[in-house]
Amino acid sequence: TEIAKYGLKSFPFAIDGVAVAVNPENAVKSLSKAQLKDIFAGKITNWKQVGGSDEPIIAYQRNTDSGSQNYMIDFMGETPLMDAPTELRPGSMSGLMDVIAPNDGSLGSIGYSVYAYAADMYGTGDNIKFIKVDGAAPTKETIISGEYPLSSYNYAIFRADEPEEGAVRRLAEWMTSYDGQLAAAKAGYATVEDIGFDYEE
C-alpha cells in the first residue's frame, strides 16, 4: 500500500462524516452530491436554483489545514473548490457554526464541519440545520451504514518500526481498546467497534 511504501503503519479507530449546515430558516432540506459540488465550485450561486428562496448563496469553507477542508477537497474530486476570500474561511469549527446561525445576513449561508463536533460538541438546536445529502441525513447510524455519502474513517498513522513497547504503540493499542473506543464514542464519533472491524484481517 501507499502507507507501507513509506515505512508507515495505519489503522482506523473511528468513523465520522462531514455535516453540511445551513441557517435553520433556509427552506432547502436536501441536496444531491452533484448540487453540493456545484455550490462549492461556484456554479450554483442562488438558493432558488436548488428549490429554495431567491437568496444568494454564501458558501463558507475552512482553512486549508483543516481536516474537514481536506475531506471536502477529496469529496469534490476533479471539481476544484472555488477560491473563497479570507472572510469566508472561519478559523475554527465554532466560528463556522456561528456565521451560519441566525443573524442578519446569514440566511444564504452554507458550510461544513466534522459531524461529531457540530452535532455533539457544539450542539444544533435552533442554531443550525443539517442538510440531507442524496436524501440521507448525517447521523451516527447513517455514517456507520455508509448511507450518508460524506463519511470516512479516521486513521492513526505511525512509523512501522516503532518499538513494540514504546509509547506510540501503547497509545495505538489504547485507541482500539474498550476504553479508547468508549472515549471516541463519548466524543461523538462512531467507532470501529460499531461495525465489528477485525484488526487481525
What kind of region is each of these model predictions?
Residues 1-201:
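Exported/periplasmic ABC-transporter solute-binding proteins
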